[in-house]
């Protein structure tokens, strides 16, 4: 419990007090935001605002997590390190994208395919790592099964690998596709949500905060726990290192809370792709390692709505040869163009995101009660 509280406090203090230092540094380096010409006119005033704030969030998370372990004497776990690996890996892809934008002085960095290639590379390496490193019980950080609140026995890709060489290729291939899909959906969902001051940061606090609750509860009801009530043995969670997942989630939330102080309207710094891809990677990693992959539809529901609005807009535009459903996508820009103030859009989207997170956590708990 000490590590849980300490990691969040330290990471929040880091970003809260040091973000102004990074803002001045980024301005000196001319790492400023460039704005789409076809975007809302009110956004043009944001041109030149410091970007790549994800660097601060990542550093704050690492500082809070590792210093907390040092102070409490606790040891890290493979699962927690894997969350940080995906977060930093995707953050690096985002940094390259942001850096190219600042060098080229335009709002486009990496090409779409180059960004996808970077995400696929990081996600594929990560997907292979999470089914390695078994502990004394033989449990790996993740499994090859699709999960909702627990692994779904009928959707275990490992079963396919038993059918010879072709089965191995198909089983691992489907597993890698599934993990890449989750990582891409989460990271790009947060990425497209990052279009208004504080929107993606606040939504990420809510979503990742859910995994603090989930990880803590899973640790109490863990099948490996020596204090587990025998009456609950039939509904215990077979999750590797759940408390450590809660600790690293707390460090991330603390870092984003401190960062949000400077990112809220009028923002003095933006997360950039560095931050949005990193936070999306953290969400994906926590969902996969806590065996709650399909529950992410609720916990990350706001990100799904934002990403879905982009997909629907583009598909409808092509099918109707130029017509649009929304005035502009992602959908938060639609409401801006409808006349909503930016802070109103952000506040209402936070409410929607919070309700979806509450529904996700509630579903998680109800499943335990019903088991």
Swiss-Prot record:
The keyword Cell wall biogenesis/degradation applies. One of its GO terms (molecular function) is UDP-N-acetylmuramoyl-L-alanyl-D-glutamyl-meso-2,6-diaminopimelyl-D-alanyl-D-alanine:undecaprenyl-phosphate transferase activity. It is found in: Cell membrane. It comes from the Bacteria. Disulfide bonds: none annotated. PROSITE patterns: MRAY_2. It is an enzyme of class 2 (transferase). The chain crosses the membrane at residues 3-23, 51-71, 76-96, 113-133, 163-183, 196-216, 242-262, 269-291, 349-369. Catalyzes the initial step of the lipid cycle reactions in the biosynthesis of the cell wall peptidoglycan: transfers peptidoglycan precursor phospho-MurNAc-pentapeptide from UDP-MurNAc-pentapeptide onto the lipid carrier undecaprenyl phosphate, yielding undecaprenyl-pyrophosphoryl-MurNAc-pentapeptide, known as lipid I. This is Phospho-N-acetylmuramoyl-pentapeptide-transferase. It comes from Leifsonia xyli subsp. xyli (strain CTCB07).
């Amino acid at each position: 419990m000490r590590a849980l509280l300490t990691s969040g406090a330290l990471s929040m203090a880091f970003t809260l007090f040091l973000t102004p230092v990074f803002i001045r540094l980024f301005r000196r380096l001319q790492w400023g935001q460039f704005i789409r010409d076809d975007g809302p006119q009110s956004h043009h005033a944001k041109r030149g605002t410091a970007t790549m704030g994800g660097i601060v969030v990542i550093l704050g998370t690492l500082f809070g997590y590792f210093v907390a372990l040092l102070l409490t004497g606790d040891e890290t776990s493979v699962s927690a390190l894997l969350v940080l690996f995906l977060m930093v890996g995707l953050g690096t892809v985002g940094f390259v994208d942001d850096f190219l934008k600042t060098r080229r002085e335009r709002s486009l960095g990496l090409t779409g395919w180059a960004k996808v290639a970077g995400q696929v590379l990081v996600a594929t390496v990560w997907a292979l790592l999470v089914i390695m490193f078994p502990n004394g019980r033989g449990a790996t950080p993740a499994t090859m099964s699709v999960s909702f609140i627990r692994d779904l026995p009928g959707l275990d890709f490992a079963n396919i690998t038993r059918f010879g060489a072709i089965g191995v290729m198909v089983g691992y291939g489907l597993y890698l596709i599934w993990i890449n899909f989750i990582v891409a959906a989460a990271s790009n969902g947060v990425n497209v949500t990052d279009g208004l001051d504080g929107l993606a940061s606040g939504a990420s606090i809510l979503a990742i905060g859910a995994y603090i609750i989930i990880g803590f509860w899973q640790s109490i009801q863990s099948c490996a726990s020596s204090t587990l009530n025998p009456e609950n043995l039939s509904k215990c969670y077979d999750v590797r290192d759940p408390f450590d997942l809660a600790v690293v989630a707390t460090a991330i939330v603390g870092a984003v809370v401190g960062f949000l102080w400077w990112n809220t309207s009028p923002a003095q710094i933006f997360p950039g792709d560095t931050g949005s891809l990193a936070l999306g990677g953290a969400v994906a990693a926590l969902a996969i390692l806590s065996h709650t992959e399909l529950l992410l539809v609720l916990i990350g529901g706001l990100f799904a709505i934002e990403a879905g609005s982009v997909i629907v807009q583009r598909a409808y535009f092509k099918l109707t040869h130029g017509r649009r459903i929304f005035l502009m996508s992602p959908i938060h820009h639609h409401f801006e163009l409808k006349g909503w103030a930016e802070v109103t859009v952000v506040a209402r989207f936070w409410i929607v995101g919070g309700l979806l997170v509450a529904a996700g956590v509630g579903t998680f708990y109800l499943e335990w009660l019903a088991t």
